[in-house]
Amino acid sequence: MYLVIAEKPSVSRAIAEVIGAQEREDGYLQGTDCMVSWCFGHLAEYVSPDAYDEKFNQWRYEDLPIIPKDWKVTVSEDKKDQFYILKRLLNSPEIEYVVNACDAGREGELIFKHVYDLSGSKKPVKRLWISSLEDSAILDGMQHLRSAEEYRHLAEAAVCRSQADWLVGMNATRAYTTKYFKKLTVGRVQTPTLAMLVERAGQISNFQKEKYFNVELDCDGIPAVKPKIFDPDEAEQLRSRCHGNEAIVTAVKETEKKVKAPKLYDLTTLQREANRIYGMTAKQTLDTAQSLYEKKLITYPRTDSQYLTEDMEQTARNVVRQIYEKYQLTGPFDQPEQPDVKKVMNNSKVTDHHAIIPTMELASSHLDELKSWEEKILFLIAVHTVMAMSKDHIYQETEIEVECQGEIFKAKGKIVLQDGWKLFENCFKNKDRMAIVDPDQEMKERMPKVTQGQTFYAVAAEKTEHFTSPPKPYSEDTLLAAMETAGNKEFDEDTEKKGLGTPATRAGIIEKLIYSQYATRKGKQILPTDDGKVLVEILPDFLKSASMTAEWENQLLLMEHGEIAPEQFMTGIKNMLTMMLNGCDAISEEETRRFQTRESIGTCPVCGSLVYESKTNFYCSNHDCHFALWKDNRYLQSMEKTMDKKMAAELLKNGSVHVKDLYSRKKNMYFEADLHMDTDETGKVNFSLSFPKKKPKTKANKKNRLEEETKNEF
């Protein structure tokens, strides 16, 4: 008997159907010689700092850095039932070995490792490594299970990535939050990404547009241009000299050019194209692609390869044929030309997973049953697959130079000789319909035939006004491209470059920036908020450096290959934390008030953000924190007292405050006591009292005392 553990229930069901585990049990599927169970994504995660020491429950700068000696993992509260099922199965005497069937990648290794380690199991582990959930792929994968030892370095990289993110996130966020009295979220990857948004926004806001002029000659219908003349008088003089005069062709250059078909999709290029064509966010595209994968309609989406392996040649031909049949391509596509599959095959360019293509399940699928986004993304992948294996786009480009009054004007035109893959690109221009645009409708920039020495008489000259343009704000498309190549110029040519994040994590990074209110979407644009701009301004360069973060990603890749040790990578992360705290020590008191726009009464004991007064309470300014001191809280109301500003400020400062004129209904007397406040990590507040050694007062005693004090004043 063996146990298969997948990442999600849907994947478990697909595997169970193939290996014959059809009997439903509580949290798993049972077969004659196997069991199939599942996680719910990250079933376990690293614990929060207070699990190592209760003092970390409160955010204090002097407690930093927080660096666990022995890392602890805990199960998410809402997933404990499934974990205990897995733990029981992993330690069952019936089970001889375990198959790790979590997603074939870095995160899949981490998900399985956490569960396996927490369970205490010592069962041998094998690895199912597949790029498709088709029955044939699962069956082949199960018949050729790999040793878990093959993926030891991948698991090490997964652990280091997760621990590095924890260390940077926890320490940097607490350091800058407690220094600036405002919740400031800092991340190993998200902060350099934010810095790119802020840099682009600065380039746009600081841009000074300049006016320039083009002078254009009409040479018997051929527009010949002298561009970018910044002096208006010079431009007008040139126009005036040329208008009505003759122009002579001094050079004609005809060049045949070929444009190769785009490569197959990896996740990043799919996300970029879906954003450009459909306006989908990176996360929407990833979620949709994952759904199509689980429905067995496309191959594994979280890939960084744009090639297929050489043993997939016949599969690729069959898939292309199936795409033609499924989408009933008409007109010039009645007979699919033999796809050039060789151009998309390269074993050296495929590591964990090959490029994203449809599966043969496309043949039996019902497209009308798919959700709108699923239908669009499947269509995008299908047509792009055909496009990538199509002929080159070939055109003839003609460049001419025309001399008029001693100045050279240039014109350019082209004639398409072979549409090739561009024919399929028209599908995307017609994105709302599953049809191919007639190529005859495509505009072709033709130029009349001209010869060197040809003269144009009485040409018309026109001056047109233009302005230089600022850089465009990032869209999800261009931001993903920038993240993918960030820091690459710092590396040698032979260095494997990974940029900021990975294809699987970039969508989440963008969403986190928006959730943290450091960035916002405006149509297709992604713009930094004012808080995002200030955060980037206050952080040291190394925390927002794209090249440093890209270097970390490269080191993780080297670790996957077994070329560097985990200790080497983690030492670098810890050294960076030390450097960060040294910089924080030097922050001036005046600088720490940068985010403060109104008077606060103190700092939150839970997260260190500023606390402000409202009509009903004193609340933490961090929207993720639930700490609040209510003016009419039940504890004080029971003693006929309300929380005022002075009391709240003292509690925030010292954790206790001496309170007079508290009333006990039971004993019908007033008394005074020290009010103590305790908080937990959720922001829940508990009050308690301690009593100074003073004589209690009744209501009558209080009245007499007040009268006596009044007399003494006079």
For each feature predicted by the language model, list its residue ranges.
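Glycine- and acidic
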Residues: M1, P68-K72, P93-V99, T178-Y180, ...
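Metal- or metallocofactor-binding catalytic centers and their adjacent structured scaffolds
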Residues: P232-Y265, Q271, S547
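Basic, low-complexity terminal or inter-domain segments flanking catalytic cores
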Residues: Y2-L3, K79, L90, T173, ...
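C-terminal or mid-to-C-terminal helical accessory/interaction module adjacent to the motor/catalytic core
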Residues: P93, A137-C219, E254-K258
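Intrinsically disordered, low-complexity regulatory segments
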Residues: M1-S162, P339, R433-M434, P470
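Amphipathic alpha-helical transducer elements in NTP-driven molecular machines
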Residues: P9-A16, D33-V36, F40, S76-K87, ...
